[in-house]
Amino acid sequence: MKVRFLYQSLLQIAGLMYAIIKYNGKNIDSVDDYLPEIKYSLPFRGKWYVVNGGITQDTSHSWDILPQRFAYDFIVIDEQGNSYNGDKENLHSYYCYGLDILAPADGEIIAIKNNFPDCRIMSNGQTDPNTPDIGGNRVTIKHSANEYSTICHLLPKSITVRVGQTVKRGDVIAKCGNSGNTTEPHVHFQIQNTYHFYSSIGLPVLFSNIKAKLFEKYSMIDNRPLSEEQEKKGGYIYRGLLLENESLKNKT
């Protein structure tokens, strides 16, 4: 493991300890513990697939990593459930690579990382050991005093906004890439209570004006069971769903 990557892993651990102490162990363990202030749009156009994430511990992206507890990973798939066509190790073979990434709601750009290279696709399905940064290129947007979105793994030098700039829901802010700790091109999306990437508390993400349906071949491409509890919570999404925005005109 590279020294820089190890350093960031230690930052994650330190951030977790800091958050536990700062918030006195008052984490968000359920969507019933927090009422979102904003309803978000999906940060992209077209139809995408939820490959990771949910609102229960069983379906969580990373339950023990507090900022990512309610995070999601999105990819684009074809009718067979494949995320690429052609050479698996060629980034350009992936359907989502280079697609526009959008602001999920109105807000102010708080932080940007824009100069990390795309990582290689490894034949063993693991992440690139030379990854210089876990989150890769990313944008953090302040939507309210208590809600910030972070979008990770963006294409190098594709970010079109600057710190301090205000954005509107649906504005193009970057393109999908493969920077950071990732096995293939995808969008990582999370809502957190501060702008700190490592020491914030992850918040449930409530979406509005989206179309969602379970991918009919889910069980053929993913052997992880789905939670019945997931399906009872309106507005919250979970892995296995195909999603798209109905409209980007709704406001906060």
Where do the PLM segments sit?
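Cationic-aromatic interfacial patches
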Residues: 1-24
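Conserved positions in beta-strands of structured domains
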Residues: 51, 108-110, 192
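Short glycine/proline-centered loop/turn elements that form peptide/ligand docking sites
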Residues: 160-162, 178-185
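Short hydrophobic beta/alpha edge segments that flank linear recognition/processing sites
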Residues: 168-180
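Short histidine-centered loop motifs in beta-beta connectors
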Residues: 147-170
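Generic structural motif
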Residues: 48, 101-109
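Zn2+-dependent peptidoglycan hydrolase active-site motif and core
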Residues: 95-96, 106-155
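Acidic, glycine-rich catalytic/binding loops that coordinate metals and/or anionic ligands
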Residues: 190-252
